[in-house]
Design a protein with these regions (language model features):
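Feature captures the catalytic cores and cofactor-binding loops of soluble hydro-lyases/lyases
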Residues: 2-169, 183-213
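Channel- or pocket-lining gating/hinge segments that regulate access to a cavity or pore
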Residues: 179-181
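C-terminal binding/interaction regions
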Residues: 173
Length: 214
């Protein structure tokens, strides 16, 4: 069960997508909230669209059990059966970047389920194909090595740590070309209202600058 229904998810996603991550970062700072800016990752594609979604957390680590190669990986099964519209995959790969936590097939499956994007401190492969999907991603690296034999999913729907930020299930993730901002679900309304004030002020200043330059 999710905290918000589809209509509520759409409201928050569409409203947060109106703002750059810089406005959200400033809003959280103004409100005295802990920084939600994720550090140390990069956009898969500098031209990827701005996106927002609710954290669907997955924690992975180097595989300790044998994989028989027959069944779906646990990550694929979670994507196929537990994701829904408005989710944004958040995969903590315990800093492993020598192995790809996923690729184009998993991204396609997620996109078809209504997932808005992916955030991981691990690596991905099939980068060109994922970029062609217009599936927004922030990641820690790239690797052609597949994960099935070497990594396993050990937890889902738990708090994870990525880029210095604790991300809890249902936190809102906003990603654009500048970076990633995480807004705790308990503070969605106040952060959004503060971001509106910040953007309105910036727009007024920009208008004054343009008038002065004309």
């Amino acid at each position: 069960m999710t905290m918000f229904n589809k209509e509520e998810r759409t409201y928050w996603i569409e409203n947060y997508k109106k703002f750059p991550t810089a406005n959200i970062s400033d809003a959280m700072d103004n409100l005295g909230l802990r920084s939600g800016v994720v550090l140390g990752l990069h956009a898969l594609d500098v031209y990827q669209p701005r996106t927002a979604g609710f954290a669907k957390t997955i924690r992975q680590m180097r595989r300790k059990t044998a994989f028989d190669g027959k069944a779906l990986t646990k990550q694929a099964s979670i994507i196929d059966t537990q994701t829904e519209y408005g989710d944004l995959l958040v995969i903590e790969a315990t800093g492993l970047t020598d192995i790809a936590t996923g690729g184009a097939m998993l991204a396609t499956r997620a996109q078809m389920r209504g997932v808005m994007g992916e955030l991981t401190n691990g690596s991905l492969r099939d980068i060109d194909e994922i970029a062609d999907l217009k599936f927004p991603v922030y990641l820690g690296g790239t690797s052609p090595v597949k994960s099935a034999r070497f990594m396993e999913t050990v937890d889902t729907d738990v708090p994870v740590f990525i880029g210095g930020v604790q991300i809890c299930p249902e936190d809102l993730i906003l990603m654009d070309r500048t970076g990633v901002a995480v807004v705790p679900s308990a503070h969605l309304k106040e952060v959004l209202e503060e971001a509106k004030k910040i953007k309105a002020k910036e727009d007024r200043i920009e208008d004054l600058v343009r008038v002065g330059m004309s």
